[in-house]
Amino acid sequence: MAKIRVHELAKELGIASKEMVEVLVELGLDVKNHMSTIEDSQASWVKKRLSKSDEDSKKQPAQPVTRDEAVKKHSGEPATQTTQKKPDNPRHVSGPRPQEGSKPSGSTGRREFSENREQSRKGEERHSANPRPGTQMKSPRNNAPRPTTRPENRSAGATGRTDNRAPGAAGRTDNRAPGAVGRTDNRGAGSASRPDNRVTRPAAGRPDNKGSRPSDAKRPPQRTVPGNTPRPVSSPERTTEKKPGEASRTLPGGAKTAGDKKAFRKNTPAFGQYQSKDYSRPGRKSKHKRKKENIEFQTPENIKIEGSIMVRDLAEKLNKNPAEIMKKLMELGIMATINQNIDFETAEIVSSLYDVKVERELSEEEKILEELVDIDDDAELIARPPVVTIMGHVDHGKTSLLDRIRQANVVSGEAGGITQHIGAYQVTIKNNKITFIDTPGHEAFTAMRARGANLTDIVILVVAADDGVMPQTVEAINHIRAAKVPFLVAINKIDKPQADPERIKQQLTEYNIVPEEWGGDTIFVPVSAKSGEGIENLLEMILLVAEMNEIRANPDRAAYGLVVEGELDKGRGAVATVLVLNGTLNIGDYIICGTNWCRVRAMIDDRGKRVDKALPSMPVEIMGWSGVPEAGGKVQVCDEKVAKEIIGLRLSEKKIEEQKQSSRVSLDEFFQQMKDAEVKELTLIIKGDVQGSVEALRQSLLRLATNEVKVNVIHSAVGAITETDVMLASASNAIIIGFNVRPDSKARKYAEDEKIDVRMYRVIYEAIDDVKKAMSGLLDPEYKEKFLGRAEVRALFKVPHVGVIAGSYVIDGKIQRNASVRVLRDGVIVYEGQLSSLKRFKDDAKEVVENYECGIGIKDFNDVKEGDIIEAYTLEEIPREL
């Protein structure tokens, strides 16, 4: 919602900024100075309010002056006679002038204002005293500053001009002499100043030295303009305090002169002390008061918010005070300042407290990306190769099956014979292309399997006929159902003697996977990766499922896809395997993924050949990235300017998230950190060859944490182990784990000098086992008590500077020096401690066996008595395991 500043509104209405501030304050708006802002809706309301008051003022009829009244004024009759004849008009009633020093009833600010004006009249009267005969003396009021215009916003009920007003109605207090006639001027809204038509006469005597005004007989009569109403005569009972609903007097067309304004501001108390008082007529509600009660900004029904919003901005959207929003957050347990960001969910909860619906507004990044998205026309779509993901339990033959299809040997290149990377390959079968994605089956590669299920069109669930349904098989089924993709089951290893395909079908029915021959909708294909049996049938089923699902794409548009895997190659830099889902990717295109961008300099297919373009469903390796992109990230083609703009926005969001994570610590969090400090910690640095393997190893190691020992991975990245990694490990006392990477010569030498433990692995479960052993070494050991023997105290000897020595007889086992002992008295433990001395006669003894006498000294214990039993034992340490 647009806003306008106070000084801009004042300029638009032709009012001084300070006067505009006073007007807005009186109208109930919260403004501080001329730079404050108000909503456009509020500004429109103010304009309507002022224009309405102007119209009301113009509609108010002026009080006519009769000819008899004018004659009486010219004849010099006091105004009191006129008012006595018309008692129904209280405005013409004049009371006795208060004595000097008395305090008239009324506001202090008005009294001081009147005194200032009276002092200015003293000087004028002194200047015009004792004129020469024949000269004319002007009324002392002629030289006083008088307003040239009238306020617009004075309605008939608050201007003090109507004749039927009750006594005490609001009016302008003027401490004039008794019987003084009110000054007349045109009080119409927006009227210009009128000429002074007063009658002058020869001056009378000099005014008294007390500064009192001339009496009625000495003052000249004043002529009133027909149609105007005389100004009310002041009285001691009058007050000039504004009613709460009365409009401001300093509006367009009615501004005071500079002198009056300065005196008024200097001597008038703050508006707030009159704000709570009600001076309206009894039994009648002021029109302005009724209007003011309706000045309540409505809470909107719907608002739009981006991902996060500041508390101040949320309050503005809800038309609420920020303090009120902060109070609501405190009730929700969130301590947020006015300039602090809160997330979308929190803003939605707060808005729901006011029955406001919140809609998520697209961020700047999403708006830019939305412009890049082209809507494909059905006429432009053509069939594309299906993307097939092979999933299943570890060692069930997934990669061997893919090798048979590709007629390649991928398994031999994998350490330990298990797949530890996610690979993408494209094969051609009978002029039809199929893209295969091979996922790891090991437990540690859960994220890889989930990613493989999400970027695929068809899934092949591989189950070994001789092994059956295993844990990772069940996990793969869950990933398939979560991704909502069609799948078929390949029962592998049917060539083995113990193979039982029917048992596999029976087991899968427990997970609602029923074969077609049993009345279900799932295709089961028995195959043998070793002999090649059933491979042709499997490929035909894949093409059949792809044809049924109408897998299509538009090659004549800007490409987008997903990152299958990312790595940091020493010779090629950051490299990512990208699967193009739609469009065509060309050399020279700018692409973005997360916070990384790339200008495509080279593309290599799955067989190592360079290609100039990548069509839909084609996996390619792309070089030239600014950093290693995250596996599973979305790849989008755009121009260079847009790419840098989007990357800048994403980096800013990332920085904000990091600041949130490292926010100020509350007292509860501080106590929690103190408790966590008691937990031992194994600090690790992980380096790997590809992003997916690093991610899988990191998640597997973090799951090893217990209540006593936790794993803290302070750094994980793709690439070789460098000297910087060793320096970080030295500073943080960490262990470096390298997965399929090696340290360079400088890093190796530096690690030897600093005695940093660097471990290299090629199989993921070996790394997990070693870390588990290291964590076991950090656990507090368990102790087992081993009984040694008992001795009975039969005599006590006091040795100076040593203490009490217990002359004892070994009745069971043996007593060893430096053993732990406990003193038993009547079967109750009296003391536990250490032996300080063990002697046989006067010689020190290492141990004393059964049926021998000895002298035993107990450390820090002398309260030994005859008949006590001293029991000796040792504590054996037993290492713990996770």
From Swiss-Prot:
Region (Disordered): 38-294
Full protein name: Translation initiation factor IF-2
Domain of life: Bacteria
Family: Belongs to the TRAFAC class translation factor GTPase superfamily. Classic translation factor GTPase family. IF-2 subfamily.
Region named G2: 417-421
SUPFAM superfamilies: Initiation factor IF2/eIF5b, domain 3, P-loop containing nucleoside triphosphate hydrolases, Translation proteins
Region (G4): 492-495
Region ranges (G1): 392-399
Ranges for domain tr-type G: 383-556
Entry-linked Pfam families: EF-G_D2 (PF22042), GTP_EFTU (PF00009), IF-2 (PF11987), IF2_N (PF04760)
Biased composition (Basic and acidic residues): 66-76, 109-128, 207-219
Segments of this protein annotated with the region G3: 438-441
One GO cellular component term noted in the UniProt record for this chain: cytosol
Bias (Basic residues): 282-292
Protein's gene: infB
GO MF annotation: an example: GTP binding
Region (G5): 528-530
Residues binding GTP, per UniProt: 392-399, 438-442, 492-495
Organism (species): Syntrophomonas wolfei subsp. wolfei (strain DSM 2245B / Goettingen)
Protein role: One of the essential components for the initiation of protein synthesis. Protects formylmethionyl-tRNA from spontaneous hydrolysis and promotes its binding to the 30S ribosomal subunits. Also involved in the hydrolysis of GTP during the formation of the 70S ribosomal complex.
